[in-house]
A protein has these predicted regions:
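Conserved FAD-binding catalytic core of PHBH/FMO-like flavoproteins
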Residues: 1-51
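Low-complexity, flexible helical/coil segments
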Residues: 9-18, 37-39, 54, 74-81, ...
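A broadly tuned preference for mixed-charge, low-complexity surface segments
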Residues: 18-36, 79-104, 138-152
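A general structural signal for short secondary-structure boundary/capping elements
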Residues: 19-23, 47, 65, 74-78, ...
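FAD/FMN-dependent oxidoreductases across multiple families
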Residues: 46-120, 124
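C-terminal helical "tail/cap" subdomain of flavin- and related membrane-associated enzymes
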Residues: 120-192
Length: 192
């Protein structure tokens, strides 16, 4: 669920704000826009906590709700979304084939990367497929991590290499994700 809201006086935050749910199966977000507008919302795997967090935030930070928008976010990676084409006229690009970073639910920038790959390989769908799978390979690993956490099958010792790969990816991409990535924080997520 997501709301577009308008604050008359002060906005709650000058920058974006994310808060993971205690279950680590979803999170609340606040994204400021311009002139007192913002997007606030929440989403979780089980769809249990969305309204609780949003309602608490709306009560604490008074604003006018402009509109309500809600839809599921697909976090299944491209590897799990094949085939990308029907072989005739239709080719999947972006979020339709899973270019959403599963740990954060962010898909706008990855979808533009995917669109660039599509344009680059518009006459060779096999090359497009190969390059998409390579570019978004880490998404499959992150998705597997999330599935193991949800199903209670993650083991820190057995899955340490995978966790380190996820950390290295996020650490290398700190600027892109707009956050400082600390290994201790990823360890907290892995223990929950």
């Amino acid at each position: 669920i997501q709301y577009k809201v308008k604050y008359q006086d002060n906005t709650p935050f000058d920058d974006f704000y994310l808060k993971a749910f205690p279950s680590m199966k979803g999170y609340f977000w606040y994204f400021p826009l311009e002139n007192g507008y913002a997007h606030i919302g929440a989403g979780d795997y089980e769809r249990k906590n969305n309204n609780v967090f949003v309602d608490e935030f709306l009560k604490k930070h008074k604003c006018e709700v402009i509109k309500k928008v809600g839809r599921p976010v697909r976090i299944s990676p491209p590897k799990n979304s094949e085939p990308f084409t029907d072989g005739r006229k239709t080719v999947g690009v972006g979020e339709s084939i899973g270019t959403v970073y599963p740990l954060l639910g962010e898909g706008i920038i990855p979808s533009t990367w995917c669109a660039q790959l599509f344009i680059k390989h518009i006459t060779d769908f096999n090359a497009y497929r190969r390059e998409v799978l390579k570019k978004f390979q880490i998404y499959a690993l992150v998705f597997k991590f999330i599935q193991m956490k949800i199903n209670g099958k993650f083991n820190l010792f057995k899955n340490a290499v995978e966790l380190l790969k996820i950390y290295n990816h996020m650490k290398h991409e700190e600027k892109r994700y707009g956050m400082e990535v600390k290994f201790k924080d990823l360890m907290k997520v892995s223990r929950i």
